[in-house]
Amino acid sequence: MRPPTRYLLLGQVFLYLGLLACVVLRPAGLGANDGISYYGTYRETFLPYAIGLLGAAYFAVRAIDALSADEKMLRLSLKIYAPLIVGIVITPYAAGRWMDYLHTACGSALFFLQLCLSGWLCWRLRWVWWAVTLSFVELAAGIASAVYLNPTHGFLFQAQVLFQLAFGALLVLSLRYLLPRSAP
C-alpha cells in the first residue's frame, strides 16, 4: 500500500476506534440525536473523541506530504479537510451559541468539501460503479444528516457515521487506482 493511501486508512482507523470507544463509554449518544459531536461535550468521552478526530486530521496532513505535487486538487482538499476537523474538535457546540455556530460552520464546510471531493474523485475515476455508489451513499447520508439536525430524536450519529464511512472508503479506494505504482 502506498504511503498516502496508508496514511488516509490510518486516519479512518483512528476516527472509528475513537468513536467506538466513545460509544462504549457513553452509549446514550446513539439515541441523543446530537451526532458525532455529542461525544465532544462530555468529560469521559472527550479524549477518545479528540484522539479519533485529530488522528484523522493528522494522517490527512501526513498524506499531503506523501502525495506527489501533481495531485494539486487532492492536496488542496486535504489541506482544507484537516483544519476543519480540528475546528470541529475545538468548538464544542454545547459551549455557547457562538461556539455552536462555529462548530456548525466547520461541520457543514467539511461535509460540503467531502461531497465535492467525492464528485471530483468519481470524475477522475471515469464514473466507475463503486465510486458512484459510495458517492450516492454519502449523499443520502448527508441528506439524512441534514434532516436529523433539528429533531429531538433521530439518527444523526448514524447518518454522520455512514457519511464518513462512504467518504473514507471512496477516498482510500480511489487512491489505490489513481496513484502511480512508483509513488513515494
Q: Where in the sequence are the language-model features?
A:
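Aromatic-anchored segments of alpha-helical transmembrane domains
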Residues: 19-23, 81-90, 137-148
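Membrane-proximal helix-loop-helix units in multi-pass membrane proteins
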Residues: 78-132
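Hydrophobic cores of alpha-helical transmembrane segments in multi-pass inner/ER membrane proteins
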Residues: 13-19, 48-62, 110-121, 163-178
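N-terminal topogenic module of multi-pass integral membrane proteins
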Residues: 1-68
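Membrane-interface helix-boundary motifs at transmembrane edges
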Residues: 1-6, 64-76, 122-131, 179-184
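Non-cytosolic membrane-interface motifs at loop->transmembrane helix junctions
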Residues: 37-41, 97-110, 154-163
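Terminal transmembrane helical module of multi-pass membrane proteins
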Residues: 125-184
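Juxtamembrane "helix-exit" motif on the non-cytosolic side of transmembrane helices
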Residues: 24, 28, 67, 90-98, ...
